[in-house]
Amino acid sequence: MENILITGITGQDGIFLTHKLIKQNKNFSIIGISRQKDYLPFYNKLKLLGTNDFSKIKILHTDLTNKQAVDLLIKEVSPTRVFNLSGPSSVYESL
């Protein structure tokens, strides 16, 4: 089974990527990283897109600026693919 790691999974791009991957109906698990602690809005947005099967998704709250935490996560998850979609949610913060 393939393990797909998505950073920024609860953001706009993460939601659309997750929806697209689940629609492919392939044998994989999705491990999402989010700085958010409330995942309900993420699942509600997936429902609006027509995704109702969340069995392949596991979301973790991890600090991506902590190298040791990220190294441990990579060892534990052993991802076959990584999509890095994390970043500031404000244009002003990204300047």
Regions picked out by a protein language model, each given a short descriptive name:
Residues 1-95:
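N-terminal Rossmann-like NAD(P)+-binding domain of SDR-like oxidoreductases, especially those catalyzing
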